[in-house]
Amino acid sequence: SHGLGGSRAGSAFLGKHWAARGYVAVFLQHPGSDESVWKDQPLAKRMAAMRSAASGKNYLLRAQDVPAVLDQLAKWNGESGHELAGRLDARTVGMSGHSFGGHTTQAVAGQRFPLGGQGLTDARVKAAIVMSPSAPERGDINAAFGNVKIPWLLMTGTHDTAAIGSQTPESRRRVFPALAPGDKFELVLDKAEHSAFTERPLPGDQQQRNPNHHRAILALSTAFWDAYLREDAAAKAWLTGDG
């Protein structure tokens, strides 16, 4: 799930790597909060258009996109003659996202909300990778994350701020200790900015990207999928420090 103003092409480095290791990588694009929001706008109006798209309505629509895509994939998997027919294992679905896409992933993967309960969670998602996580701006953070039942891997950086929104590097790191214990992991990349998890630098970056960040993201994310989607004991032992 891409970030605000992004597209399904924004993290090809992840998709290519995971696909090369046997995973079917499906990239969502969320109408209403994707690149179409700003592309045709004059430069002076682009930030305002992006802020407008960072709405509660789009947040809900994004979360609703996920089950719709999973339903369609299941249909294609059982459709004779389709190129994906029989190639998908619906029992082993993982979800990942960055920034607004990370927020979307949180919603689908077990975050609770004061008014909405757990109504956005999709039980088909068995593991989640959240890049640039978001702490709730209101309410009890422990109530939000204390009942997450599936494995989560959080990734952020010590300079992980975004041009839109109130999240800080410190608020992003508040999510991990609030998660229910068991099969939860966090990677904090030193000096990594918000763009560390994207295909290319973002406007407003303050420093050169560290190529080792992508290497760490790829290695850890793949080990996480292997551990919890393939039940690979060696990968899980490596993640937990026992291997």
Regions from the PLM with identified roles:
Residues 190-243:
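Alpha/beta-hydrolase-fold serine-hydrolase catalytic core, especially in secreted/extracellular enzymes
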Residues 3, 99, 132:
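Catalytic nucleophile serine of serine hydrolases
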Residues 92-94, 129:
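Residue in the alpha/beta-hydrolase core beta-strand immediately N-terminal to the catalytic nucleophile
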Residues 97-101, 105:
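Gly/Ala-rich beta-loop-alpha elbow adjacent to hydrolase catalytic centers
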Residues 1-38, 137-138, 161-165:
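Short substrate-entry loop that stabilizes the transition state in hydrolases
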Residues 117-191:
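The feature captures the conserved acid-bearing segment of alpha/beta-hydrolase catalytic domains
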Residues 41-90, 107:
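Alpha/beta-hydrolase active-site loop
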Residues 52-57, 139-141, 204-215:
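Active-site rim elements
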